[in-house]
Amino acid sequence: MKHKKYKTILADPCWEQKMAGKYATRHKRIRELPYPTMNVEQIKNLPIKDLAEEGCHLWLWTTNQFLKEAFEVMETWGFKYLTTITWVKPSGCGNWFVSRTQHCLFGYKDKCQFKKARYKPTVFFANIPKRHSEKPMEFYDLIESISDENRLELFARQKREGWDVWGNEVNSDIKLNSEEVKQEAMQSEARHSSQA
């Protein structure tokens, strides 16, 4: 399968987190997340670097708990950090602090290019969607107002027009076999080198 390159990649990794402390001891609470998770090394090892065009925008969701690791993932995938967009929720949960925010790190590959609207706010307020871990639809509008096609959503929950998707809850448009993607990227680089 030939992989295309993307100008926009949105990722909402299924960070490996479990309920802990007092929260886990409450009998009526779920102790495990209602979906499969990946550890940080598994997320880092996804071949995202090979799917990104020069100037590609990366929008990487993270929780407060995994903020440090999200920066590591961004760097491993070959992106440079530019800013953080914070989603302020109307309610939250937590043991010691009530966490009402989630963050999306924005980065770019090689050079930062904006061909569309700029000067967007880095904080937004939106209601919490009905499904666990789902992000607000307004965020897609924000991305589409800034970042170009081709667009790819990783760990997608549903298909959105104008986007390719990959995830265990959707019919994926791409395969993310690390070796397959890396081999194809090497062949593509070899072709470009021989033409130069």
What annotation goes with each model-predicted range?
Residues 1-196:
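Class I S-adenosyl-L-methionine-dependent methyltransferase catalytic core
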